[in-house]
């Protein structure tokens, strides 16, 4: 049986054979007050259910389809909001960066920095992120096979950072559609020598509208897709929720309604406990 690596976010262990961690929040920081509201709800629910939790939001959505789409408050204001969330709720935070210059300032505030899928092969950005010593979450590009993610892990290791989490978010299946290959989770574990794998169920539900500038989505299928991912035995779920998804400023069609969070997580925890309670069967 392949040994599973453990990455620590502070004193929080992240591994494929440990109880799942929730990396979740909102897509983009829309306002300080909304971030506080959403984070508080996540903290209350995860504490009640005993689920390890890391708050997620972006300060800049630098890869929006349209130049007219909302991008966020920017790094300076975003980091102020993140610091207030940490001070208020004692929560760990994950956010994404897009340039080398953002790496150290962001790593000084948050606990995990994320390498976006579209930038996952950019060596200069990888080097800058690695040098911070922070835990890194790598989004697997939609165009990359599960076998190839091991190359990204190796690149970070060559740059001196082995604190790597890998995130599945679906693969391109023809034009404007994403499909999650459930066999890919096991392949990613093997190709990365047991690195923690988390599943971004929210962005896996995106479906492009070829006639429009915004992404559509299939949030009504969140539960079934998340269950399928959890059943493969992974380290965590990556999720976005919103009090009113139809009014969200980014990716609302894929976001979970915030009032569904507790029943959703109850089912995910029950399934995760069941799956990880089974004896491992090794087939060669």
Curated annotation (Swiss-Prot):
Locations listed in the record: Cytoplasm
Q: Which reactions are catalysed by this chain?
A: D-arabinose 5-phosphate + phosphoenolpyruvate + H2O = 3-deoxy-alpha-D-manno-2-octulosonate-8-phosphate + phosphate
Molecular functions (GO terms)? 3-deoxy-8-phosphooctulonate synthase activity
Q: Which residues form a coiled coil?
A: none
Q: Give any Gene Ontology cellular component.
A: cytoplasm
Q: Keywords in alphabetical order, please.
A: Cytoplasm, Lipopolysaccharide biosynthesis, Transferase
Q: What is its EC number?
A: 2.5.1.55
One biological process term in Gene Ontology: keto-3-deoxy-D-manno-octulosonic acid biosynthetic process
Taxonomically, which superkingdom?
Bacteria
Gene3D superfamilies listed in its UniProt record: Aldolase class I
Pathway per the UniProt entry: Carbohydrate biosynthesis; 3-deoxy-D-manno-octulosonate biosynthesis; 3-deoxy-D-manno-octulosonate from D-ribulose 5-phosphate: step 2/3; Bacterial outer membrane biogenesis; lipopolysaccharide biosynthesis
Classification via HAMAP family: KDO8P_synth
Q: Which family does it belong to?
A: Belongs to the KdsA family.
Instruction: List the protein's name.
Output: 2-dehydro-3-deoxyphosphooctonate aldolase
Q: Which organism is it from?
A: Vibrio atlanticus (strain LGP32) (Vibrio splendidus (strain Mel32))
